[in-house]
Amino acid sequence: MGGEALTLPKDLLDFSGYGPKELQALLDLAERLKRERYRGEDLKGKVLALLFEKPSLRTRTTLEVAMVHLGGHAVYLDQKQVGIGEREPVRDVAKNLERFVEGIAARVFRHETVEALARHAKVPVVNALSDRAHPLQALADLLTLKEVFGGLAGLEVAWVGDGNNVLNSLLEVAPLAGLKVRVATPKGYEPDPGLLKRANAFFTHDPKEAALGAHALYTDVWTSMGQEAERAKRLRDFQGFQVNGELLKLLRPEGVFLHCLPAHYGEETTEEAVHGPRSRVFDQAENRLHTAKAVLLTLLK
């Protein structure tokens, strides 16, 4: 693909090493790829290893399809096959894969695993989700908001729910994109105070206070993969934090609903919200593809 070359850090584990210019350039590239429905041979002959400890619909599919659309291939390796950190040390997995492939996308339980992969592998490593961050999701979120509102600077985005990895990445990109984030979580489920401070985010334990007048209202599941033993307690603790039609009424008239999916209806949201007129949930899902293309095209080319 023609155009000015974009230089980014070797790995995308989170957004450290990114400034407003790098983030904007990546989003601009994703917009262009989407607009042109781009297909090319930029990554012809190149292979991406998908090293997944967790199951996935959007992340696996979009990364595989992105590689196909760019002329490359993806190889899927799940935990049963590899046993990363169990059957074989992370360092050894990294040193093997760097001999076979041009990049690694890792979906892991512990962020330390993806950090170790990046430290030991000479090829680029992309964090396809860890307990600390979900950068690919944050890029899709930003692209969706930009499409809806025409820009990002000054938008107020409310987060209602768990102070989890998706929120962490949103807080990371907020100051780079000029977003104003308003966060509401139950007591005991707050995000990293350092991230809140760096994002200059507003924090409350009241969902209505966070949602009032926002451009977008964002939520995620109350119980993430690996937290199943906490499910009953979480269901109790998160009562009152459901994003439903009543809470969505507090947004601006043009306000939209975001969810990274999968959705657990009757818990953090409702079927009516996800499939309602304010929802941009499936635009977010589609934009996972275009932003994945932008990342892979930049890091692997």
Curated annotation (Swiss-Prot):
UniProt cross-references to Pfam families, sorted A to Z: OTCace, OTCace_N
Record's subunit section: Homotrimer.
UniProt key word Lipoprotein: no
Gene Ontology MF terms: amino acid binding; ornithine carbamoyltransferase activity
Entry's EC annotation: 2.1.3.3
Thermal properties of activity per the entry: Optimum temperature is 65 degrees Celsius. Highly thermostable.
pH-activity profile: Optimum pH is dependent on ornithine concentration with an optimum at pH 8 for ornithine concentrations around KM values. Higher concentrations shift the optimum towards lower pH. At pH 7.0, the maximum velocity remains constant even when the ornithine concentration is very high (> 10 mM). At more alkaline pH, however, substrate inhibition is observed above 0.25 mM ornithine.
Family under the similarity heading: Belongs to the aspartate/ornithine carbamoyltransferase superfamily. OTCase family.
Subcellular location: Cytoplasm
Role noted for this protein: Reversibly catalyzes the transfer of the carbamoyl group from carbamoyl phosphate (CP) to the N(epsilon) atom of ornithine (ORN) to produce L-citrulline, which is a substrate for argininosuccinate synthetase, the enzyme involved in the final step in arginine biosynthesis.
Record-linked InterPro entries: Asp/Orn_carbamoyltranf_P-bd (IPR006132), Asp/Orn_carbamoylTrfase (IPR006130), Asp/Orn_carbamoylTrfase_sf (IPR036901), Asp_carbamoyltransf_Asp/Orn-bd (IPR006131), Orn/put_carbamltrans (IPR002292), OTCase_ArgI (IPR024904)
GO biological process: arginine biosynthetic process via ornithine; citrulline biosynthetic process; L-arginine biosynthetic process
Underlying gene: argF
Source organism superkingdom: Bacteria
Enzyme class: transferase
Disulphide linkage map: none
Record: residues binding L-ornithine: N165, D220, S224, M225
Keyword Cytoplasm: yes
This protein's pathway: Amino-acid biosynthesis; L-arginine biosynthesis; L-arginine from L-ornithine and carbamoyl phosphate: step 1/3
Protein name, UniProt field: Ornithine carbamoyltransferase
